[in-house]
A protein has these predicted regions:
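Accessory beta->alpha helical hairpin/"wing" motif in late/C-terminal subdomains of nucleic-acid enzymes
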Residues: 83-87
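Basic amphipathic alpha-helical segments that dock to polyanions
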Residues: 52-59
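N-terminal helix-turn-helix DNA-binding core of bacterial DNA-binding proteins
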Residues: 8-51
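Beta-hairpin "wing" of winged helix-turn-helix
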Residues: 60-77, 82
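Short, contiguous hydrophobic alpha-helices characteristic of membrane insertion segments
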Residues: 7-8, 63, 115-116
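Amphipathic alpha-helical dimerization/coiled-coil segments
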Residues: 88-117
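Short, Lys/Arg-enriched N-terminal segment that forms or immediately precedes the first helix
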Residues: 1-7
């Protein structure tokens, strides 16, 4: 898949995907989180490094994740992130909201008549 074919992440969904990734995978560094999201999406989503780090800063400020310094698998200093109890609660709320919105959008798409070409 080319870079042009990769989808931008829907606004407001990156927080949800980061929280879910940390909840499922445990403590990870920012690059690892971004790569995991890309892998799970079969490379359909491209996670910009600048975007992921702004997201991580925002989630730390909201106390949905915590950050600690450590050493990465390639022996480099890196900041590692973990979901907090508050983050787990937020993940549950955002997941419920996402499922509701996705269901509504699905209904609209099913009901909308197809246009002739």
């Amino acid at each position: 898949m080319t870079d042009q074919q990769k989808s931008d992440i829907l606004q407001g969904t990156l927080d949800l995907m980061v929280l879910k990734t940390l909840d499922a995978m445990g403590t990870m560094h920012g690059y690892g989180i971004a790569r995991r999201i890309e892998q799970i999406s079969a490379e359909a989503l491209a996670v910009n490094q600048g975007t992921i780090y702004l997201c991580l800063i925002r989630l730390v400020q909201k106390k949905w994740i915590s950050a600690t310094w450590g050493v990465s698998e390639n022996n480099r200093k890196a900041k590692f992130y973990a979901i907090t109890k508050r983050g787990q609660k937020q993940l549950a709320e955002e997941t419920e909201n996402w499922e509701r919105v996705a269901g509504v959008i699905g209904k609209v798409l099913e009901l909308a008549p197809a246009r002739s070409k």
